[in-house]
Design a protein with these regions (language model features):
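Repeat-based scaffolding regions
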Residues: 1-75
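Cyclic nucleotide-binding regulatory module and flanking cytosolic helices
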Residues: 62-110, 187-224
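Regulatory nucleotide-sensing modules
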Residues: 82-139, 259
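Short strand-loop-strand
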Residues: 121, 129-131, 232-275, 279, ...
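Cyclic-nucleotide recognition modules
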Residues: 145-199, 304
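A residue-level detector for short acidic-glycine micro-motifs
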Residues: 171-173, 251, 297-299
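C-terminal output/interaction extensions
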Residues: 180, 185-207, 301-330
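Short beta-strand-centered aromatic/proline hotspots
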Residues: 246-247, 293-299
Length: 330
């Protein structure tokens, strides 16, 4: 960098001595060196200086723009561009550069809230690694809408509007994100308007939160629930060495089971999206039925005295014959 600084001073010396041609040549070489060193801001400011010194040095002005652009493309994280190839394939090289260098990077730890339902969120989040849970709160009820992973984004429902978030997002594991701020969107509207349109078109192709909510309600209505009593052993599969919890069964269907569990609100919210194993045995005078199923927690509903009504969706539907036998124990 010290050598760069001395060369910049030499440019000014050339100008004072009316050696414009030498100043342009040296400035062009400096732009190339800064771009190669990935100091893109400095390279761009020197290119502006080049234009000020000699606006007729068109060859150097055009070539320096290409040098910076190519260096920026080469410096883009290949893992990110591969993860988001389905987005970048719709963009020009200039738009790809504007998008990539217009984003910020962030890391969220497990159970850290990314944005909260009912609050303003001026960001769009692109997931590069990890899992994000999207859930909806109504009164004391929490419903898992979706679990998102690399190559998926979240926050699109409010990014292009001035409305509050209709759902909450929380890191389900350590999550690496790229964040687009609305200030970048406003800048692109003047500098890269097609990028804004393409990004909005891309987001409009995603399933809206209201549709996810309707789908959850339809799933709930499709398979009738049957009351069931007794206790079950629950083990959270996402946690290594997780202990077994004893819970009180409430109801069961082909697609899932519900039970009552005591815990804090924070712990309850963190369970959304977790995989579990559920074991229980129902006994009558001359028969018994054992169930050993794995599923995913899709709903958490607050009751009194730190009790929570937990909804689980089976990974594999319950056998019809087994359910018919369970119903006789009701």
């Amino acid at each position: 960098m010290e050598d760069f600084s001395s060369q910049e001073k030499l440019v000014e010396t050339y100008l004072k001595e009316n050696k414009k041609e030498q100043a342009v040549e040296l400035l062009f070489n400096l732009i190339d060196q800064y771009a190669e060193a990935r100091h893109f801001g400095k390279a761009e400011s020197l290119r502006e200086r080049l234009f000020e010194i000699d606006s007729m040095a068109l060859d150097e002005i055009v070539k320096s723009a290409d040098i910076i652009e190519n260096a920026k493309m080469s410096a883009m994280d290949p893992a990110h561009t591969e993860t988001w190839s389905h987005l970048y394939q719709h963009l020009t090289q200039e738009e790809s550069i504007a998008l990539y260098y217009g984003m910020q990077s962030a890391v969220y730890e497990p159970e850290q809230i990314i944005f909260q339902q009912g609050e303003m969120n001026p960001h769009l989040y692109l997931i590069n690694a990890g899992r994000v849970k999207l859930f909806y709160h109504k009164d004391q009820h929490a419903i898992l809408l979706n679990t998102l992973g690399p190559g998926e984004l979240v926050g699109e429902d409010t990014f292009f509007t001035n409305s509050t978030c209709t759902a909450s997002a929380m890191a389900d594991s350590k999550v690496k994100l790229n964040i687009i701020e609305k200030s970048a969107l406003h800048k692109w509207q003047s500098d890269e308007p097609n990028l804004v349109n393409k990004l909005q078109d891309y987001c409009s192709g995603l399933e809206p939160i209201k549709d996810l909510l309707q789908k959850k309600e339809l799933e709930r209505r499709t398979h009738p629930r049957h009351n069931i009593s007794g206790s079950a052993a629950i083990k959270i599969l996402d946690n290594k060495g997780s202990k077994v919890y004893k819970v009180d069964l409430s109801d069961i269907s082909i697609s899932g089971v519900s039970f009552i569990m005591n815990m804090s609100k924070t712990a309850a919210d963190s369970l959304l999206g977790c995989r579990l194993n559920c074991k229980f045995t129902l006994r009558a005078a001359f028969s018994e039925i054992s169930v050993d199923q794995e599923g995913c927690i899709v709903g958490v509903h607050g009751q009194l005295f730190n009790e929570y009504y937990i909804n689980v969706k089976w990974e594999e539907p319950l056998d019809d014959g087994l359910l018919d036998r369970i119903k006789t124990f009701g």
